[in-house]
Design a protein with these regions (language model features):
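Active-site- and interface-proximal helix/loop "cap" or "latch" segments in soluble metabolic
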Residues: 26-117
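N-terminal Rossmann-like FAD-binding beta1-loop-alpha1 element of flavoenzymes
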Residues: 126-154
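Glycine-rich FAD pyrophosphate-binding loop
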Residues: 147-167
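Conserved N-terminal/central alpha/beta ligand/cofactor-binding core
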Residues: 160-272, 387, 394, 432, ...
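Helical element adjacent to the flavin cofactor pocket in flavoenzyme catalytic cores
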Residues: 251-308, 346, 352
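A glycine-rich dinucleotide-binding beta-alpha-beta segment and adjacent secondary-structure elements
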Residues: 281, 289, 487-490, 501-586
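Glycine-rich loop(s) and the adjacent beta-strand/alpha-helix scaffold that form part
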Residues: 298-301, 305-370, 374, 595-598, ...
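An anion/pyrophosphate-binding glycine-rich loop and adjacent beta-alpha core
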Residues: 346-348, 355-494
Length: 627
């Protein structure tokens, strides 16, 4: 929590509490909109003081907003005011907690005054390369530009380096030294194979030049990381069952640790990062070249940065409801959005003539919105049991669960949610400790798979604790994400479909399982495991998980942003999730593409922008672009 002690002292000095003291402890609750949905804060007031505070927001990103909520509540109690400092990297969640806490306390008759913000002086700064957004791609862009001789300024709206990259696990690359060490000359695939795979997945609609550049340069990004003391290692096997027969291309790293090393190198190379500073408008000269940006600082003062090249690395638009509705349609109201930015970086580029690229979402798994579950959904939502839509009808080959992107997209096509149904016999089998495992693979094998005799994780889940499973269904029932139905009629009522349709689906599916042959969607015989026959029936509702959003502007292979005629906009570059063309229609299901492209595009854009800045010849007059 940034400057917590100092900032809180200032707040307390100016905060005044009004209202009569309470004679006994009372609880009050209020809600406010956070990052992914509503955040509810419950406060306990005793003798006119804040005795306790709790916050809950099931749609907040666990690693960011989820982690911030208890910190904020602790600060509210410790400092006896809702107006505490926000937590770095979780501004929207922080503001929601503060707003909801203030509203809850107002119910108790307690009101507070915010500390007056003293506006600082406006500033003008000059540099060769300006990087807007210091997430994963912005970090490598800034460092690469500096290492290529540019004077670099980075502006970041939070105080956290790396953004959502802090939650990333690994990246795609082919032809690395790490693969050479493992495979020697028998790698099994090459750049040609992976380029064709990317293009085939996009039905040849992808940006071929950009994809080719990425496939060829990703290995150099891995080496770049290694050269900067970042621990990168080749995964022992593919992350999901669907990719077990492919060359291992997933290169893991240590989550937040890489950005500790990145910060050291940014400091060594003189990169000037302006924290809590948000770019609001790009500047152009009379010829249309982008020559800087106007930014707003936390205290309301203005920072104007004059630059010879600008790289926009502001991340996805998942926090922008209008853009997300454009990408998802009516499914927006059903999906679980895990994280993302507000799309302001894209809007700034559109304002200077950037062509609008395809807007996509990163569909990555399906699960309930309920939290604090122990074991149930590891199986009900992660194995190839029976899945149905809101009409009670089967809609996919459940083998798609071997890849989170594929089955998540299938569920999105059903409106963003779907249901699984298993019977008591299946649960009994899953909980039978006389067996070594549950008998069915789970696609998150590397998280939940049991340890085999060789000490490695397997694709199978260990038998579950039935009591824990039942406790989970109590939670699911309470939150509306599940039910234990004694009859098919009850199951149909929960789903909202006709009993006849659901019963026909179940009867047909049971026939496929018993025959060992799926005549509808051709699920493999070895995965036709669980009939649905005798109640009680365990029904789980799962929502499409959206990790973020992809795209917004088109670029060439140099990461130069282009206009509607595919002509580069002078001195403007974009990286990472701002860029369209790597995925088309749906997030590409090649492991590590997101982080791999973020880091690689940043590294390349930084080098290209630095080179361009050396030949930059500014026009005498600098003006703001007017649409």
């Amino acid at each position: 929590m940034k400057n917590m002690k100092t900032a809180l002292s200032a707040v307390l000095a100016s905060a005044m509490i009004f209202g009569a003291a309470m004679a006994s402890a009372e609880t009050y609750s209020a809600s406010a909109k956070g990052f992914g949905g509503d955040v509810t804060v419950t406060v306990t007031v005793e003798d006119g003081k804040i005795a306790a505070a709790e916050a809950a927001g099931i749609s907040e990103t666990p690693a960011l907003g989820g982690a911030a909520m208890p910190q904020l509540c602790e600060a509210i109690v410790a400092n006896q005011t809702p107006y505490v400092d926000t937590v770095s990297g979780a501004t929207l969640t922080s503001n929601a907690v503060i707003e909801a806490a203030a509203a809850a306390l107002a119910q108790a008759g307690l009101t507070f005054e915010k500390a007056e913000v003293v506006k600082g002086e406006d500033e003008v700064a000059d540099c060769d390369v300006l990087v807007i957004g210091m997430g994963a791609s912005g970090t490598t862009a800034a460092l690469s530009a500096a290492e290529n001789g540019a004077k670099v300024i980075g502006v970041e709206s939070s105080t956290t380096l790396g953004g959502m990259g802090n939650a990333a696990q690994g990246m795609f690359a082919i032809g690395t030294t790490l693969q050479q060490e493992r495979y020697g000359d028998d790698l099994g695939s090459d750049e040609e194979y992976w380029f064709n795979k990317y293009m085939e997945q996009s039905n040849e609609l992808g940006n071929a030049a950009l994809i080719r550049t990425f496939v060829g340069e990703a290995k150099n990004t891995v080496q770049y990381l290694l050269d900067h003391d970042i621990n990168v290692y080749l995964s022992k096997t593919a992350q999901q069952v669907a990719h077990f027969d492919e060359t291992i291309i997933y290169h893991r790293w240590n989550n937040t640790q890489p950005f500790v090393h990145f910060q050291e190198y940014l400091d060594k190379n003189g990169v000037d990062i302006r924290w809590n500073t948000t770019a609001t408008q790009l500047l152009t000269d009379e010829a249309g070249a982008v020559v800087g940006a106007v930014c707003t600082r936390e205290d309301g003062s203005q920072l104007t940065v004059n630059a010879k090249a600008v790289i926009v690395s502001t991340g996805s638009f998942a926090g922008n409801e209008s853009m997300m509705r454009e990408a998802l349609g009516t499914a927006y109201d059903n999906v679980s959005i895990m994280g993302g930015c507000d799309g302001s970086g894209l809007e700034m580029m559109y304002a200077v003539g950037a062509a609008k690229g395809e807007l996509l979402t990163m569909n990555h798994g399906v699960g309930p919105k309920s939290r604090d579950l122990e074991v149930a959904t590891e199986l009900t939502m992660n194995t190839p049991c029976l899945w149905v839509n809101n009409q009670g009808k089967r809609f996919m080959n459940e083998d798609l669960l071997k890849d989170t992107v594929e089955y998540s997209s299938a569920v999105l096509a059903q409106g963003g949610y779907a249901y699984t149904i298993v019977d008591q016999a299946t649960v009994d089998r899953w909980a039978d400790a006389s067996y070594e495992n549950t008998g069915s693979w789970i696609h998150y094998w590397d998280q939940n798979g049991i340890i085999g005799e060789d000490g490695e994780r397997t694709i199978y889940h260990a038998p579950i604790d039935k009591d824990a499973f039942l406790r989970d269904f109590e939670t699911l029932t309470a939150t509306g994400d599940g039910i234990v139905a004694n009859t098919i009629e009850e199951a149909a009522a929960f789903i909202g479909c006709s009993v006849e349709d659901l019963q026909n689906t179940i009867d047909t599916y049971n026939g496929y399982v018993k025959a060992g042959k799926d005549d509808q969607f051709f699920k493999s015989a070895e995965d036709l495991l669980w009939t649905v026959e005798e109640g009680p029936f365990y029904v789980t509702k799962g929502y499409n998980a959206v990790l973020g959003a992809l795209g917004g502007v088109n670029t060439n292979e140099l990461l130069q942003v282009v206009d509607s005629t595919n002509t580069p906009i002078s001195s403007l570059y974009a990286t990472g999730n701002n860029v369209s063309g790597m995925s088309v229609a749906a997030y590409v299901n090649i492991e590590g593409t997101g982080l791999g492209f973020a880091l690689t595009s940043g590294r390349l854009a930084g080098a290209n922008a630095a080179a361009a800045s050396k030949s930059f010849r500014p026009l005498p007059k600098v003006v703001r672009f007017k649409a």
